[in-house]
Amino acid sequence: MPFDSEIVEVKTRPGEEVATLAGGCFWCTEAVFERMEGVNDVVSGYIGGKIKNPNYKQVCGKMTGHAEAVQIYYDPSKTNFEELLKVFFKTHDPTTLNRQGADGGPQYRSSIFVHNDEQREIAKKTMEKLGEEYRDPIVTLIEPATKFYVAEEYHQDYYRRNPNAGYCQAVVAAKVRKFNRNFGDKIKGSGK
């Protein structure tokens, strides 16, 4: 249980909303959503744990209970929370508990961190609709969006800055290709 289970308000610019999603390694999730039309910014960080100000070593050491997650700042006139969730579910495996590929542990859990009751309802309905598309049950959690801790600078825009790194070539690039294949009309600058 997080040390603080109350939803924390996030400051956004006028005309902007925020979604907080955890779908395995934040490098992957960030790389996918940075390409999506209507998304203004994506920030990698940690949420849902039991200590304040966690760092990467602590989170990966499974000592904090935090998930690697991203905060997605988006323009609701160009996209919406349900569309973000559709991309989220199609670009990671929501049926594996605390695991995405070779990455295992609670920090890699699949979670939707909701900022309000409307997001909670949209998340539930989207999971019900998409659940029929999977052979195994969806294990994605719906959790309150507690305090989000921005990850260390070297994690931000990791794929964009390190496209030739081994993990990026082996794992992140595959997620980006999946996004491009399934959501070509949602790629920034696609004109659709």
From Swiss-Prot:
Keywords: Oxidoreductase. One of its GO terms (biological process) is protein modification process. The active site is at 25. InterPro entries: Met_Sox_Rdtase_MsrA_dom (IPR002569), Met_Sox_Rdtase_MsrA_sf (IPR036509). Its EC number is 1.8.4.11. It catalyses: L-methionyl-[protein] + [thioredoxin]-disulfide + H2O = L-methionyl-(S)-S-oxide-[protein] + [thioredoxin]-dithiol; [thioredoxin]-disulfide + L-methionine + H2O = L-methionine (S)-S-oxide + [thioredoxin]-dithiol. GO terms for molecular function: L-methionine:thioredoxin-disulfide S-oxidoreductase activity; peptide-methionine (S)-S-oxide reductase activity. It holds the Pfam family PMSR. Has an important function as a repair enzyme for proteins that have been inactivated by oxidation. Catalyzes the reversible oxidation-reduction of methionine sulfoxide in proteins to methionine. NCBIfam families: msrA (TIGR00401). Belongs to the MsrA Met sulfoxide reductase family. This is Peptide methionine sulfoxide reductase MsrA 1. It comes from Rhodopirellula baltica (strain DSM 10527 / NCIMB 13988 / SH1). The gene is msrA1.
